[in-house]
From Swiss-Prot:
Belongs to the Sp1 C2H2-type zinc-finger protein family. The lineage of its organism: Eukaryota, Metazoa, Chordata, Craniata, Vertebrata. Residues 429-439 have a biased composition (Basic and acidic residues). CDD domains: SP9_N. A zinc finger (C2H2-type) spans 308-332, 338-362, 368-390. A motif (9aaTAD) lies at residues 166-174. One of its GO terms (biological process) is positive regulation of fibroblast growth factor receptor signaling pathway. Residues 384-439 are annotated as: Disordered. This is Transcription factor Sp9.
Length: 439
């Protein structure tokens, strides 16, 4: 306590308990140990605000890496600190430092000397300072790339943002580049709203001569206004960067390739047409068509007949159309692609005309009428059969009536008409044929 009254601090050790005791003695003491130049304004307690004393604070000066030394008048957030100014500095009136400050000042002075000699340490500290310089003026920004589009449109951003050190995203430092990101005068806005696309022409000439005439040739024929064409050419120019140069010319190359392919295909087509004279006709795999294809020009007579035979052994049926032959082949394969959509029916047929005939049984339509007796029939073969009864005489009229009745009740099946007639009423068919034999 005697040393405290005389104004000298005891020489404490480095133990935490001794440091805590010294701090408590300072706080509880009302003697003018920590007298400040304006200590008359603070008369309470012995607790004084942290301020720099007349003597230099070694603690603040020994921490160069933790002080943010930024002095910018244009920035909204300025932090001006002196060479030794720090919030951690202790007030002291004695010109000579106390034991506490002396020990730590020697410690931090050694650190400062070592850090000044170490190049890696100084590089790290300078990096911290530069990051702090680029960080604090951008406190108001919400996006890391706002300097791209706010440099020319907003005046609240300080000028050092646009004129400061170039960061990693400032890749277009050339004033003649297509996007003026470092010009605070707003050249981006003026270039986007210019009336004529001459600037784009001058910029396109630096990339590739193939794109120099795109804006005039593409928009002069369509009648687009110069402003609209300029905006479109701007977006078109954005695609002409180095990464897209190999993509855009593929349209012209594709047209040339299509021309080459069409030429090659036309050559192949002419060769095939020379071997096959009737190229417009649908291809057929029947034996007659294959024989005519094998004979070449000598098989012109077979092609002229237009006969298509069934290739199934033992059948030998011949049709004049390929569609009829295909429908006939469904009889052999059992394929029935035509389905009745009537409620709860679902029957399937091999031919479309059979499906239409079957639908008449649901609707009750009788399309075919006899010109003699005015009777109506659902099927044309039933009508022709009925007409034979009129021409044969009165003997077959009774049978024709019975045939008409059965035709109204009969539902068509997926069988040939000959089998249907024989299966429904073989007696009538015999009577119908007997007058012909007699005559």
């Amino acid at each position: 306590m005697a040393t405290s009254i005389l104004g000298e601090e005891p020489r404490f050790g480095t133990t935490p308990l001794a440091m805590l005791a010294a701090t408590c003695n300072k706080i509880g003491n009302t003697s003018p140990l920590t007298t400040l130049p304006d200590s008359s304004a603070f008369s309470k307690g012995g607790f004084h605000p942290w301020k720099r004393s007349s003597s230099s604070c070694n603690l603040g000066s020994s921490l160069p890496g933790f002080t943010v030394a930024t002095s910018r008048s244009t920035s909204g957030l300025t932090t001006t600190t002196g060479a030794g100014n720090s919030a951690f500095c202790l007030a002291s009136t004695s010109p000579t430092s106390s034991a506490f400050s002396a020990e730590y000042s020697s410690l931090f002075s050694n650190t400062t000397s070592v850090s000044s000699q170490d190049s890696g340490q100084s590089a790290f500290i300078s990096k911290v300072h530069s990051s702090a310089d680029t960080l604090y003026p951008r406190v108001g920004m919400a996006h890391p790339y706002e300097s791209w589009y706010k440099s020319g449109f907003h005046s609240t951003i300080s000028g050092d943002v646009a004129n400061g050190a170039s960061t990693w995203w400032d890749v277009h430092t050339n004033p003649g580049s297509w996007l003026e990101v470092q010009n605070p005068a707003g050249t981006l806005q003026s270039s986007l709203h210019s009336g004529t696309p001459q600037a784009i022409h001058s910029q396109l000439s630096g990339y590739n001569p193939d794109f120099s005439s795109l804006t005039h040739s593409a928009f002069s024929s369509t009648g687009i206004s110069p402003t609209a064409s300029h905006l479109l050419s701007t977006s078109q120019h954005l695609l002409t960067q180095e990464g897209f140069k190999t993509v855009i010319p593929t349209y012209t190359d594709a047209s040339a390739t299509n021309a080459m392919i069409s030429g090659a295909s036309s050559g192949i087509g002419t060769s095939s047409r020379s071997s096959r004279r009737y190229s417009g006709r649908a291809t057929c795999d029947c034996p007659n068509c294959q024989e005519a294809e094998r004979l070449g020009p000598a098989g012109a007579s077979l092609r002229r007949k237009g006969l298509h035979s069934c290739h199934i052994p033992g059948c030998g049926k011949v049709y004049g159309k390929t569609s009829h032959l295909k429908a006939h082949l469904r009889w052999h394969t059992g394929e029935r692609p035509f389905v009745c959509n009537w409620l709860f029916c679902g029957k399937r047929f091999t031919r479309s005309d059979e499906l239409q005939r079957h639908l008449r049984t649901h609707t009750g339509e009788k399309r075919f009428a006899c010109p003699v007796c005015n009777k109506r029939f659902m099927r044309s073969d039933h009508l022709s059969k009925h007409i034979k009864t009129h021409t044969a005489g009165g003997g077959g009229k009774k049978g024709s009536d019975s045939d008409t009745d059965t035709s109204n009740l009969e539902t068509p099946r997926s069988e040939s008409p000959e089998l249907i007639l024989e299966g429904v009423n073989p007696r009538v068919t015999v009577k119908d044929q007997s007058p012909h034999h007699e005559s």
